[in-house]
Amino acid sequence: MDRTVQQTDYDALSCRMAAITRGYLPSQKQIEQCGYEGYTEVHVEYCNVLRRLSRRLYSRVQKACTTLLPVMNYGSFVRTVSVDVELHKYVAGFGGRAQVVNLGCGSDLRMCMLLERYPELHYVDVDFAETVKMKREVLMQSAELCRRIGASSTSPQEQDCVLHGPRYRLLAGDLRDTGALLELLQKHTDADLPTVVITECVLCYLPREAAQALIREVCGFYKSGSWISYDPIGGGQREDRFGSIMQSNLREFRQLELPTLMEFNSKEKYSARFPAPSNIQTMWEYYMTDISEDEKRKLKTLQFLDEVEELEILLSHYVILVTSW
């Protein structure tokens, strides 16, 4: 099960690269609000190095760039933009004097843009040991990526911290083991700094008890912070079969389990898992209210979207939540 969950990281990377290749990303919001520079170049560089290290993984990413349907590219667009905008709001609110803790980071590359823009920002990525070791290999073989995160070929490596830079750390940890994770965070982060935690398609893969312990202990560790969480929800209506079909397909074709998909199957139930009041939107709501008409018109020129109703169904079963304490 661990390995199949780890492989979902390359699904996410493939989706981002497909959206970049087709022109969905970077969006106007990422450029104008987040101030992202070199977004496409960073991702292309990462994939070029990945190609040298693993042609199998690179081929998987490249295949998605030509085969993903428009509805999937729309989904990648709103997922990426919504998380980026909320993350930037928090970091910018403290003038960059904050820290980001990305739990279940995978191949996410936001740190490359944010660390370059905010010289006082600290950024911590956490994921399975196998995942972060590959990420370290890719980062360390690129002079440009190393420059952006402030690392070098002499950056130290420890058993639990595979990349130890002045403002960026890449940690190996199992999110199901809350005690060990807290020890990692105590060692490598500052509990007094304003902290924003990211879980992007992470909580849905954890057993209920592990997910709730993670939320409780991490919120309790940092004196003040915000949590940005993106996940699928099963759907709360009796006639809604989206979640059950999704579970069945993932179980049959990917050997993946989503333990809490049908338990926290609505916005209300999902937000209730967090101790503080939360703002939560489905991705369809976000698309309708937060994406400008200019951006929507641009999206329509990229690929022909045959079924808007299909897009609405898909985006209505994913949420972004933001909570603060």
From Swiss-Prot:
E.C. no: 2.1.1.233
Reactions performed catalytically: [phosphatase 2A protein]-C-terminal L-leucine + S-adenosyl-L-methionine = [phosphatase 2A protein]-C-terminal L-leucine methyl ester + S-adenosyl-L-homocysteine
Listed InterPro entries: LCMT1, Ppm1/Ppm2/Tcmp, SAM-dependent_MTases_sf
Coiled coil: none
Pfam families, sorted: LCM
Record carries keyword Transferase: yes
Binding sites annotated in the UniProt record for S-adenosyl-L-methionine: 79, 104, 127, 174-175, 200
Keywords of the record: Methyltransferase, S-adenosyl-L-methionine, Transferase
GO function term, MF aspect, one: protein C-terminal leucine carboxyl O-methyltransferase activity
Any Gene Ontology biological process: protein-containing complex assembly
Family: Belongs to the methyltransferase superfamily. LCMT family.
Function summary: Methylates the carboxyl group of the C-terminal leucine residue of protein phosphatase 2A catalytic subunits to form alpha-leucine ester residues.
Name by which UniProt lists this protein: Leucine carboxyl methyltransferase 1
